[in-house]
Amino acid sequence: VRKRWLLFSLLGGLAVLALTLSGHTPGHTPGGADRPLRPPPAGLYGWDWQIGATDETQVGMPSGIRLIDLDAFGTSAATVARLKAAGLYTVCYINAGSYEPYRPDAARYPARLKLGVDPNWTDEAFVDVRDVFRPRSVLAEVLKDRLRLCRDKGFEAVEPDNLQNDENVPGGVITLQDQVDFSGWLADAAHALGLAIFQKNGPDKVLLRDRTGRRLADKFDGILNESCQRYDECAPLAEYVRRGKPALNVEYDQKFLDCAGARRLGVNSMFKDKYLVGRREAAYRRVACEPRP
């Protein structure tokens, strides 16, 4: 499930134009060498998720947070720098497993990649994640360029959405192993650019091995989950905690927020408004579990 708005399309287009004018082209790494990876903070702490902010002027910093997650296309390098200067760890949202028609790179997705309509977002389509392993893969190049966009804006980590196409695409076209292999590929691609990366949802997959033989909980640098308390699936998130990595969770119905239970597992859980808007917007809601009771 993703929560973000169409107005990011215009902002994203301007960002792509700016990168082009500054000499960035798809497939090019500015400066040649990539930076060292900085992992996200471990342990219990406050964080926020504002990927649905109408625009970046609506983004704000709640007191006491250490990490913030924002949209790749809708957030400027200047905003990222400001947040980092304030001491925040910055995470970059991209949609890895779906086609979104309003993104500035949407024209790069051929029809053959689109396997099924997302019932929650009917203008979108789940993509064929197997494509990244094919020669001259279109999807691999699109996603690598999105990762470069995150890196070039100064983000330290990435949140890739829709890593459950084995469940989302009808007819069993994408197998469980196909999906796990794709997730592992994303982790490797992010790390190659000096970006940390969160597993998005799929707590049942944390101990599965990709084609390199490594478990997802060993490859990813943390996990960001939605509604694990509502669906009683938080326990697997503790695999990340045991590895010294952060586990983040959001509930969209406050009655399911169980702070004592989250703390026992080492999970950073909070209640958020459904559309994850910016802190300065009227619809913004956030009730976070305190790191200590």
Per-range role (PLM):
Residues 17-35:
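C-terminal region of N-terminal signal peptides and the immediate post-cleavage residues
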Residues 30-293:
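Glycan-processing catalytic domains of CAZymes
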Residues 1-10:
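N-terminal Sec-pathway targeting helices
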Residues 9-17:
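Core hydrophobic alpha-helical transmembrane segments of single-pass membrane proteins
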